[in-house]
Amino acid sequence: MALGSAALFVLTLTVHAAGTCPELKVLDLEGYKQLTILQGCPGLPGAAGPKGEAGAKGDRGESGLPGIPGKEGPTGPKGNQGEKGIRGEKGDSGPSQSCATGPRTCKELLTQGHFLTGWYTIYLPDCRPLTVLCDMDTDGGGWTVFQRRLDGSVDFFRDWTSYKRGFGSQLGEFWLGNDNIHALTTQGTSELRVDLSDFEGKHDFAKYSSFQIQGEAEKYKLILGNFLGGGAGDSLTPHNNRLFSTKDQDNDGSTSSCAMGYHGAWWYSQCHTSNLNGLYLRGPHKSYANGVNWKSWRGYNYSCKVSEMKVRLI
């Protein structure tokens, strides 16, 4: 083998054999003799050195993405009540309303632009506010309803005190109360309208030129004007100038109690031609004259489905 003058040649011969690991190296340097190096097998690993000191703390990594929310835990115990807060400032005063400026009748409400039938507050002559049903649809509107029967949901066979104060429900049947009716009908001349319906779908009415009841000292005596007409006919005039009677106060002209005998409360004479506060018997009935009767319309053996008594200031 020829060797260049300025080159370094390394000839490496590696011999691998099972169980052997020598490696023979022959080096030939220009101008020197050949040098042969024989490398032996690696020795056994030395013992582990001592543990090095901990390195300096690295920079904190960036926060990872939020994990999936866990399930809601059970409700904890109720906490103690907090301290009472500071009282708020007084609000602005609402629009003033008094008996001097407030409406006195449903007719007055109608003239003020209240055209829907419903419950309104009016003011009686003694300044008492009174919630009343205003019929704004029938015969020109402006009627104050003081009696209504329509489904038998309210018991009308009651005592003197109940009729004095009034009873029933705004959602159904009611009697406005004799004291209230007296106050309403002493403000001036009020006309009366009685609206009736039967269970066959027929409707009719009776109308009177004036209607007033006196105070309790006069036993709520009825003062009735002329019958003006209506298909229901006149079944109230015979009760004119009669006193009001209930099951516990008999003021009629009969030797027996008309209120007890006909299960009602009315301006009975001897005894009646109308009994609109009688038993709610739902149409034809075999019993005599103890239903919601108006003799001139359906007779003594037919109890009306609906009756409404209402007044309007003229």
Curated annotation (Swiss-Prot):
GO terms for biological process: cell surface pattern recognition receptor signaling pathway; complement activation, lectin pathway; G protein-coupled receptor signaling pathway; host-mediated suppression of symbiont invasion; positive regulation of interleukin-8 production; positive regulation of opsonization; protein localization to cell surface; proteolysis. Disulfide bonds join C99-C127, C106-C134, C258-C271. GO terms for molecular function: carbohydrate binding; carbohydrate derivative binding; G protein-coupled receptor binding; metal ion binding; pattern recognition receptor activity; sialic acid binding. Residues 1-17 form the signal peptide. Ca(2+) binds at D250, D252, S254, S256. It holds the Pfam family Fibrinogen_C. Keywords: Calcium, Collagen, Complement activation lectin pathway, Disulfide bond, Glycoprotein, Immunity, Innate immunity, Lectin, Metal-binding, Repeat, Secreted, Signal. Residues 49-101 are annotated as: Disordered. GO terms for cellular component: collagen trimer; extracellular region; plasma membrane; serine-type endopeptidase complex. Residues 40-96 form the Collagen-like domain. May function in innate immunity through activation of the lectin complement pathway. Calcium-dependent and GlcNAc-binding lectin. Belongs to the ficolin lectin family. Homotrimer. Interacts with elastin. Interacts with MASP1 and MASP2. This is Ficolin-2. The gene is Fcn2.
